[in-house]
């Protein structure tokens, strides 16, 4: 553990007053660390410290149990805690079964309850367990911390979830081609409560703060993708960038209401993010949560058809697993900037109908790794 890291205070409420939680990635990382501590050092821990992706912080995570399964394997369990976020995995038992291997490599495996990726278009390739990149990085860091400079003998990390196959049925995983269980997720290690009415109300507060000093422009981002563009290219201050989660319609309504109160016209409202969320607006969807709206395959395929792309490509887009898969499909074409620019134009026009006090709504789309797709490319 890096001594300069500070403890992350999970008990401190989020800006909207709601409780934060631990991601499945943090839980799995804690289980890995606890299991490896017993396997290598004989330490039976009831709490472990894990390094968060933010280099300034570590997180203390209680360990529910840790025990030898056999003479070669240790299993540790951690309970998922989602805070006030309505997470299907809240209270689930996330576990890691850890043993040494002779390969000299760290291997990620799916234990019962964690799904396997079967289709392209996700951040993990087919044939791999549904453990996302950041949780994998966190687990690698935990392994390095326990090894503490000792040679790496090769370690198998089998990550699972009790009743994960049942929990997964209440998620988007079956439609995404993730079979057999849940995904191990998280980009920060911390669950920021985003889906309750209290979060929607907090968006109005953030919008008011963003517009409070009468700036000529602000930005909405469904997630973290696009924040760098807002700061580095658009020159927006942090407080002028509002993370709106899935609540596009509510956020636009709040912006219009505040602008009416201020009696002014906003020059530009930027909407920055991944087309997986934003393209749903082509279907007139204002709440982009996966539980309330489907994926926008027909709509993005329709744009391709309107632009005269070959019918075979249009059919391939329709059958894509995710919109990120569409990004990959379109990367095989010689010039797709115009395609994404048309999606930007159409979604911006749709949003503009809700904010007549905004002179220009401008959309900029980015792939999952932050690569600009349309106008910004």
Curated annotation (Swiss-Prot):
Residues in coiled coil: none
Molecular functions per Gene Ontology: cobalt-precorrin-5B C1-methyltransferase activity
Keyword terms: Cobalamin biosynthesis, Methyltransferase, S-adenosyl-L-methionine, Transferase
GO biological process: anaerobic cobalamin biosynthetic process; methylation
Protein's pathway: Cofactor biosynthesis; adenosylcobalamin biosynthesis; cob(II)yrinate a,c-diamide from sirohydrochlorin (anaerobic route): step 6/10
Highest taxon above the source species: Bacteria
Pfam families, A to Z: CbiD
Catalytic activity of the protein: Co-precorrin-5B + S-adenosyl-L-methionine = Co-precorrin-6A + S-adenosyl-L-homocysteine
Signal peptide limits: none
Gene3D superfamilies (alphabetical): CbiD-like
Residue ranges of the region described as Disordered: 1-21
EC number(s) given by UniProt: 2.1.1.195
Family (UniProt): Belongs to the CbiD family.
UniProt xrefs under HAMAP family: CbiD (MF_00787)
Protein name: Cobalt-precorrin-5B C(1)-methyltransferase
Species annotation: Chromobacterium violaceum (strain ATCC 12472 / DSM 30191 / JCM 1249 / CCUG 213 / NBRC 12614 / NCIMB 9131 / NCTC 9757 / MK)
């Amino acid at each position: 553990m890096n001594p300069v890291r500070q403890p992350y205070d999970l008990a401190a409420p989020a800006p909207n007053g709601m409780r934060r939680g631990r991601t499945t990635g943090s839980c799995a990382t804690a289980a890995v660390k606890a299991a490896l501590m017993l396997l290598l050092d004989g330490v039976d821990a009831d709490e472990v410290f894990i390094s968060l992706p933010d280099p300034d912080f570590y997180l203390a995570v209680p360990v529910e149990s840790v025990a030898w399964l056999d003479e070669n394997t240790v299993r540790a369990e951690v309970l998922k805690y989602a805070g006030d976020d309505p997470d299907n995995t809240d209270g689930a038992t996330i576990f890691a079964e850890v043993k040494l291997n002779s390969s000299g490599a760290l291997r990620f495996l799916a234990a019962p309850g964690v799904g396997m990726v079967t289709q392209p278009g996700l951040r993990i390739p087919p044939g791999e367990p549904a453990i996302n990149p950041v949780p994998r990085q966190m687990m690698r860091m935990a392994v390095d911390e326990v090894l503490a400079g000792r040679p790496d003998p090769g370690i198998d990390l089998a990550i699972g979830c009790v009743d994960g196959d049942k929990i997964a049925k209440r998620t988007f995983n079956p439609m995404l081609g993730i079979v057999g269980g849940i995904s191990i997720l998280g980009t920060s290690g911390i669950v920021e409560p985003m889906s309750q009415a209290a979060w929607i109300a907090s968006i109005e507060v953030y919008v008011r703060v963003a517009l409070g000093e009468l700036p000529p422009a602000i930005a909405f981002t469904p997630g973290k993708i696009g924040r760098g563009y807002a700061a580095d290219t658009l020159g927006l201050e942090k407080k002028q960038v509002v993370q709106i989660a899935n609540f596009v319609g509510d956020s636009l309504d709040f912006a219009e209401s505040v602008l009416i109160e201020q009696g002014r016209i906003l020059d530009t409202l930027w909407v920055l993010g991944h087309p997986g969320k934003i393209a749903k607006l082509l279907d007139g969807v204002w709440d982009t949560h996966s539980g309330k709206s489907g994926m926008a395959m027909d709509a993005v395929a329709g744009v391709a058809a309107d632009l005269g792309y070959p019918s075979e490509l249009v059919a391939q887009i329709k059958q894509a697993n995710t919109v990120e898969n569409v990004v990959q499909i379109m990367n095989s074409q010689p010039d797709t900037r115009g395609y994404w620019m048309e999606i930007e134009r159409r979604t911006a026009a749709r949003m503009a109908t809700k904010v007549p006090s905004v002179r220009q709504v401008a959309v900029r789309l980015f792939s999952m790794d932050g690569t600009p797709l349309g106008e910004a490319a």
